[in-house]
Amino acid sequence: MRVATIFTHYFEICTLTIVIFGYLGLSLSQTKQETKTMAQKTITSSAFGDSKPHYELLDGLRGVAALLVIWYHVWEGFAFVGGGMIENFNHGYLAVDFFFMLSGFVISYAYDDRWGKMSLKGFFTRRLIRLHPMLIMGAVVGTITFLIQGSTQWDGTQTPFGWVMLALLLTMFFIPALPGARYEVRGNGEMFPLNGPSWSLFFEYIGNILYALIIRKLSTRALKWWTAILGVALAYFAVMDVSGYGSIGIGWTIDTVNFWGGLVRMLFPFSLGMVLAREFKPIKVKGAFWICSALLVILFAVPYLEGEYLNGLYEIFCIMMVFPILVWIGASGSTTDNASTKVCNFLGDISYPVYIIHYPFMYLFYYWMMQKPQCPTFGEALPVVAILIIGVIVLAYIILKLYDEPVRRWLAKKFIKA
């Protein structure tokens, strides 16, 4: 009965968010006053009045990682159109694993001590309100860019409008596309063809469900054993190249290897993030934000490592060794003045919108490159790249302020009991 209630809540929130999307004025009239009230707290763009204060540096690092994902996908375009490997910023896909670890840390910090007064329904409602409005926006943006592109699959096949609308509806309710299905409209096997990166949120949802039902109940010792077992599984996937991709960049489609690989890829860093949160004791580090940001850039910029096991070992080194240190340092540090606080809060606020809306514009960027007689050089593409990155940041901020925050506040008032 409880499960049925939760699913009813899920579809109600999804449906209401879709309705609100077409009627943004519903909550905008109160935005100015609510923003003034929110500004008096040390919380960023949360819709919940009882949210704990954020780790500001972790918010900032999440924003840095989101921007680095865009940079990685820019270079992915040159590799895709040029028919080669990603020569620059090859390991940018590891940002997703960093996101999963941050998520485990933050969710454990935010919710572990609330279960005496919070139900499963309350937890799932909060997570849906936090994540789903932007998922819907990402699907809408992806639909618009796909139509601008001419509704053309990668092989040049034209996709009927009806299938595009079905893909939009399924994405709004977060139902993944099966490879080869008519509603898998781009034709390259993506779980969410209108907005590819939504795959990571698919596994994030699974992680949230498993956290609420099982993982949170584990003792810290049991959680460490659980994490160690997952670490062995992840190392096997990475080092043995189970996917055949030459990397651990798995999870984006719904075949057997990608589903189980994506699940392990999410669960290990998520669980390790929980361990870090439970064991956390701050250390003193000067310049923590800049140190961690620089290390992320360096780690992601390492080129592909040739050799039977070398690249997989490097991925495991990053995920198992370096990322936990970065999370610990980031959680230990603090902003030193009002300006640095605003920078970290801004980066944290735009991180999710940037991540979830950027890839539809990457599709357009790839399409633009494919129309050229030959793959343009980076210098030739630089003006377009600059416009793309700046445009995504500006649009993400506008969507955050005019859509995401008002909608989340409205949904929180409706569904969250004070």
Spell out what each predicted region is.
Residues 58, 122-123, 131, 200, ...:
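Alpha-helical transmembrane segments and their helix-entry boundary regions
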Residues 128:
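Active-site helix-to-loop segments that bind/position phosphate- or nucleotide-bearing substrates
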Residues 40-57, 64-92, 109-121, 179-189, ...:
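Alpha-helical transmembrane segments in multi-pass integral membrane proteins
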Residues 131-205, 233-251, 256, 318-331:
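Membrane-interface helix-loop-helix regions
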Residues 100-110:
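Central hydrophobic cores of alpha-helical transmembrane segments in multi-pass inner-membrane proteins
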Residues 1-48, 413-418:
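Short, intrinsically disordered terminal tails adjacent to the first/last structured region
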Residues 208-224, 228-229, 272:
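Hydrophobic, aromatic-rich transmembrane alpha-helices
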Residues 59, 63-66, 96, 103, ...:
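Residues within membrane-spanning alpha-helices of integral membrane proteins
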